[in-house]
């Protein structure tokens, strides 16, 4: 489910934005940098894709590196190779890290920050940042609402409308920084008895 946290934010300033929109974009970008910046981060998530699936797990980021753990699936990506373990089928599948086919949902969550209008509301101890896609936007995400802690700027929840369905993500145990590179090294010997499938492009 890593695609749910793969937003591509931008610090670009839109000349005709309102003050509220500029503030909303700054808040969103600050939190994005806490999650996806070079210092790395980790969080726990509980995802509900309405009418499709529910899943919870833990994820780590650091630059182009990524790792997650769920009840059935585990994955490690060191920025070059992506390794996914299916605990039920006892398989290890390898992909190039930049292959969009490594996750069947990933292509549905395309996001361009310039395709949205931003708006922020006061939610008491939180900021409520709403993103609405422009009518001519090509991305699949049409609406998004992020709940961000005012004091820590940590993400608390995210609600996304993709095409016709809604996805809700509750976030907890967020930490930014102090993420070791060793976390993203795939422990191949641990799964040596599994069936291995290599889907990397051959050179």
Predicted regions and their residues:
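Bacterial N-terminal signal peptides
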Residues: 1-7
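Non-transmembrane domains of secretory- and envelope-associated proteins
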Residues: 13-20, 123-125, 135-144, 151-203
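Short, solvent-exposed coil/turn segments at beta-strand boundaries
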Residues: 37, 59-67, 76-82, 123-124, ...
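Short glycine/serine/proline-enriched coil/turn segments at secondary-structure junctions
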Residues: 50-52, 75-76, 136-140
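An acidic-aromatic
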Residues: 58-105, 165-168
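Surface-exposed, polar helix/loop patches in the mature regions of secreted/periplasmic/lumenal proteins
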Residues: 83-138
């Amino acid at each position: 489910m890593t695609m749910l946290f793969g937003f591509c934010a931008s610090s670009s300033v839109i000349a005709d934005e309102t003050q509220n929109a500029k503030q909303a974009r700054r808040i969103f970008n600050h939190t994005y940098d806490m999650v996806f910046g070079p210092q790395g981060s980790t969080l726990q998530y509980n995802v509900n894709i309405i009418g499709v699936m529910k899943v919870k797990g833990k994820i780590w980021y650091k630059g182009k590196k990524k790792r997650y753990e769920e009840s059935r699936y585990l994955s490690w990506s060191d920025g070059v190779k992506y390794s996914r373990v299916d605990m039920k089928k006892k398989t290890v599948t390898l992909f190039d890290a930049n292959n969009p086919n490594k996750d069947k949902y990933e292509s549905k969550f395309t996001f361009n920050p310039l395709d949205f209008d931003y708006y922020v509301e006061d939610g008491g101890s939180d900021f409520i940042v709403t993103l609405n896609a422009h009518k001519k936007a090509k991305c699949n995400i049409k609406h998004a609402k992020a709940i961000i802690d005012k004091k820590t700027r940590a993400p608390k929840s995210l609600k996304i409308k993709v095409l016709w369905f809604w996805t809700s993500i509750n976030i907890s145990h967020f930490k930014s920084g102090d993420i070791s590179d060793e976390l993203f090294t795939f422990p191949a010997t641990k799964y040596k008895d599994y069936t291995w499938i290599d889907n990397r492009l051959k050179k």
